[in-house]
Regions:
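Interaction interfaces in information-processing and related assembly proteins
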Residues: 1-229
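Broad hydrophobic/π-residue packing in well-ordered secondary structure
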Residues: 148-149, 236, 252
Length: 258
């Protein structure tokens, strides 16, 4: 089992697609932190998207920290990534487990909470780190990242994240981000909307053994996608204690308020 990130261009370069299979990352996190199924799904989604963001960093020492502070029982969720997409994370209450929601799915939104903030801290070698923040939209995490990209980075995107958990652990985990390039038109937007609507969930597509390239074709409606980066194999890497990570985050927050 290998974690993998592959990036594509679709619709003649007007659409950027980044796909990730993070199954091993999430399973490693589950084992290390003894996560409940609910915590596995929530932290797993956050780790998946944070890793995908890290893969865009330019310099080796760059990093991104994402923290979600909702009013749900899980407490605070934190993930940190480097420029290779390697990621680590933790949740305040890792054993919290909620009943399935009304549609029979793990209730990530209920566990994270629908009130609160998401913080993105990018440390890219400048005097001060960049700090972006947006209110939590649903607590389902993918929708919250979609809001962040639209509001803080002015990048219209579709974000999908999924973690499939069974009695043995993490069966599949992964995600994708579809971003419109500046020259994208209403035609490309309509094609993407239609393709995403007609696609299965990311966790089901991975469970059905679709490759990341097949997934990218499905969610863009473009059979002629172009691979632009396929040499990214991120891992779950825990290289510091939770206390050190909290100190690092507090330092960023202090500078943000100065």
């Amino acid at each position: 089992m290998e974690n993998k990130i592959i990036k594509f261009l679709a619709h003649n370069g007007k659409v950027l697609v980044k796909c990730i299979d993070s199954t091993k990352i999430v399973e490693d996190a589950r084992k290390i932190h003894d996560l409940s199924p609910t915590a596995t799904a929530a932290l797993g989604r956050l780790l998946t998207m944070t890793s995908l963001m890290g893969s865009d960093l330019k310099e080796e020492e760059d990093s991104i920290t994402v923290q979600i502070k909702g009013d749900g029982k899980l407490g605070i969720l934190t993930a940190v990534t480097d420029s290779k997409g390697n990621v680590k994370g933790y949740v305040t209450n890792p054993r919290v487990d909620l009943p399935l929601n009304d549609i029979g799915k793990i209730d990530v939104g209920g566990a994270v909470g629908k009130n609160g903030m998401m913080y993105i801290i990018k440390d890219i070698g400048l005097k001060d780190p960049y700090v972006g923040m947006t209110p939590i939209v649903s607590g389902e995490i993918a929708e919250d990242f979609t809001e962040y990209f639209a509001k803080s980075e002015q990048t219209p995107s579709v974000v999908a994240l999924g973690v499939l958990v069974d009695k043995n652990g993490v069966k599949t985990a992964g995600g994708y981000q579809i971003s419109l390039m500046p020259d994208a038109t209403e035609e490309e937007i309509s094609k993407i909307e239609e393709a995403v609507k007609n696609s299965d969930s990311i966790s089901k597509m991975l469970d059905d053994k679709l490759s990341l390239e097949e997934i990218a074709k499905k969610v863009t409606g473009d059979e002629n996608i172009k691979v632009i980066d396929k040499n990214i194999s991120p891992e779950y890497k825990c290289d510091c204690s939770r206390a050190v990570s909290y100190t690092h985050l507090r330092a960023h927050e202090t500078r943000r308020h100065l």
